[in-house]
């Protein structure tokens, strides 16, 4: 059985990590390379860097950052934000990223998934889905959760897989930031429906939440941000806890 992965996520704006961070001894608390290196040392399996700057200037800054991350960090990392066409993918992979995450662009143009898979391989293509539980179903949203679509989580995830996605990164908008645990029922349904790994996102508040999303939610990986950035959970402690709970993780 594949080892379960712990994946810190860093939101990047103008080259800086934007969620407040209070690790001690950081010369620059917002330095995403420094932070990524710290997580790597603590035992993170992968990293996700999301570019939340929309400007052309921001894109260039982000590409430079990807080069820096690739030069300093040995674990795989995924980049997302503002990826709309193949040349964006090419630029970021050439800068050193291992995978790209597409969200709104895939909903607007599902053929982009096939293009990425065909040109770079399915393993490069992570389809991120933001969905909110409403009227007894999981509705997918665009633009960072601001614009509702006519797509629903399970059918869209299946379509993404059939088009060549290598992984699904599912963020529950219902659970995000609440720190009350992941959307494990929906995650388990996804895991049973799909043949590719599912990354759980949204809801991590304590170590038990990671255990539950791996055992009950059947997630292949768990992504979190603030619990790591604010030092509430150390990754090395989390890994040991999960191992003690019988979850297969790399220590």
From Swiss-Prot:
GO CC, any one term: cytoplasm
EC primary class: lyase
Top-rank taxon: Bacteria
Major place of residence: cytoplasm
Gene3D superfamilies, per database record: Aldolase class I
Cytoplasm recorded as keyword: yes
Location of this chain's protein in the cell: Cytoplasm
Subunit annotation: Heterodimer of HisH and HisF.
Sequence similarity: Belongs to the HisA/HisF family.
NCBIfam families the UniProt entry points to: hisF (TIGR00735)
Name this protein carries in UniProt: Imidazole glycerol phosphate synthase subunit HisF
